[in-house]
UniProtKB/Swiss-Prot annotation:
UniProt key word Ribonucleoprotein: yes
Skewed-composition ranges (Low complexity): 233-244
HAMAP family cross-referenced by the UniProt entry: Ribosomal_uS2_B (MF_00291_B)
Stored NCBIfam families: rpsB_bact (TIGR01011)
Organism, as annotated: Corynebacterium urealyticum (strain ATCC 43042 / DSM 7109)
Record keywords: Ribonucleoprotein, Ribosomal protein
Name recorded for this polypeptide: Small ribosomal subunit protein uS2
GO molecular function, one term: structural constituent of ribosome
């Protein structure tokens, strides 16, 4: 079964690119034509690239990897948060902090601070002995950290790969991923640079419906990958149990054989 149909892509407006005066010549090969000063993306190619991206994400997750969802522009914020949360993956949908990947050790300290403030807020006597002004400042600090880091609260290491909506807006995130050798899967509009990503998905990164559809496809790939991982783990556990049972049976056979030999020796004596 196809990951997505041509009709679904058309209905979501994935084929609409930018105005012809706003483009990156490197995207020429992904453009079908232009109409009324707007580039039209070749959706036949998009379908092929979606399949490649889907398979990559699925296999990455199946082998224990995690995918960081990134989309801070207004049109992508809701889709990125909803789809990432649906499949239990980290996400950034408000502001990318410089060094979020390349200086993850420092980010981890800020995550620890956020959790400390959350625990303080949840405890009945968490603010005991503090003034109203101090409590107000602590709450503001917590809310600010939650806004920026809430989506990666459970991320304990840099991601295995990254899904990005609008590589131009998220150029810092893409640059950090490149420095660390983290593969990037991304929507590439007609003003983007395809050389910046490993798994391009030519499409409209400005329309809400397009961002929703393409991000949901990636989250579905994550879902399939998690199922495949669970199946592999179950099969491995079954094999291990079988080997254990076999070993125990072999041990019993050896013991029985030794007992028989001992009995025979006693009889002969």
């Amino acid at each position: 079964m196809a990951v997505v149909t041509m009709r679904e892509l058309l209905d979501a407006g994935v084929h609409f690119g930018h105005q012809t005066r706003r483009w990156n010549p490197k995207m020429r090969r992904f453009i079908f034509t232009d109409r009324n000063g707007i580039y039209i993306i070749d959706l036949q190619q998009t379908l092929t690239y979606i399949d490649e991206a889907y398979e990559f994400v699925k296999e990455t997750v199946a082998h224990g990897g995690n995918i960081l969802f990134v989309g801070t522009k207004k049109q992508a914020q809701e889709a990125v948060a909803n789809e990432a949360e649906r499949v239990g993956m980290p996400y950034v949908n408000h502001r990318w902090l410089g060094g979020m990947l390349t200086n993850f050790q420092t980010v981890s300290k800020r995550l620890a601070r956020m959790k400390e403030l959350q625990a303080m807020d949840a405890a009945e006597d968490g603010y005991q002995g503090r003034t109203k002004k101090e409590i107000l400042l602590l709450n503001r600090e917590r809310e600010k950290l939650e806004r920026v880091l809430g989506g990666i609260a459970d991320m304990t290491k840099v991601p295995s790969a990254m899904w990005v909506v609008d590589t131009n807006k998220e150029h810092i995130a893409v640059s950090e991923a490149k420095k660390l050798g983290i593969p990037v899967v991304a929507i590439l509009d007609t003003n983007c640079d395809p050389d910046e990503v490993q798994y391009p998905v030519p499409g409209n990164d400005d329309a809400i419906r397009s961002a929703n559809l393409l991000t949901s496809i990636i989250s579905s790939a994550v879902e399939e990958g998690r199922k495949a991982r669970a199946e592999r783990q179950a099969a491995a556990a079954k094999d291990a149990a079988g080997d254990t049972g076999k070993s125990e049976a072999d041990a019993e056979a050896v013991k029985a054989e030794a007992a028989a030999e001992e009995k025979a020796e006693t009889t002969e004596a």
